Amino acid sequence: MLVIFLGILGLLANQVFGLPAKNAGHLYSTENPPEEELGFWCTYMESCRFCWDCEHGICKNKVNESMPWIIENSYLTTCAVSRWYDQCMYEEGNAKHYHTMDCSNPVPHNRPHRLGMKIYEREDL
């Protein structure tokens, strides 16, 4: 009984936090993941271009309101994401760097990219 309860609780947590459920099916490699999964994909690889709305070189994160506005530069990278059973994978940039993780136990891959982030600071008008 406890196992069933914990299983149901886990599925509910996945829905609340935007994590892809194990039974969500496979996601073939795409540069435009489903809108309802952006919360998951953009948390663990926030430099992906699909996580940002950019206009005139200034970008705002689509998912995380606490992220600062940034200047569009090499920090943003083209990413393709895919899911096969419990394996979630990011394929980033032209060099095709891969980051693979268990979807149920995700690991952020943000640190190496944050070094290139340029925060936008408004000048006083």
Curated annotation (Swiss-Prot):
Membrane topology type, per the record?
Single-pass membrane protein
Q: Which residues lie on this side of the membrane: Extracellular?
A: 28-116
Q: Which residue windows are transmembrane per the record? A: 7-27
User: Major place of localization?
Assistant: host cell
Q: Name one Pfam family in it.
A: v110
Keyword Zinc-finger appears in the UniProt entry: no
* Keywords, comma-separated and alphabetical: Glycoprotein, Host membrane, Membrane, Transmembrane, Transmembrane helix
Q: Which residues form a coiled coil?
A: none
Q: Which residues are glycosylated?
A: N64
Q: Which InterPro entries match?
A: ASFV_fam_110
The answer to whether UniProt assigns keyword DNA damage to this entry is no
Q: Which residues lie on this side of the membrane: Cytoplasmic?
A: 1-6
Q: Where in the cell is it found?
A: Host membrane
What cellular component terms from Gene Ontology apply here?
host cell membrane; membrane
Q: Which domain of life is it from?
A: Viruses
The entry's function note states: Plays a role in virus cell tropism, and may be required for efficient virus replication in macrophages.
Q: Which family does it belong to?
A: Belongs to the asfivirus MGF 110 family.
Name this polypeptide is given: Protein MGF 110-3L
Source species, please? African swine fever virus (isolate Pig/Kenya/KEN-50/1950)
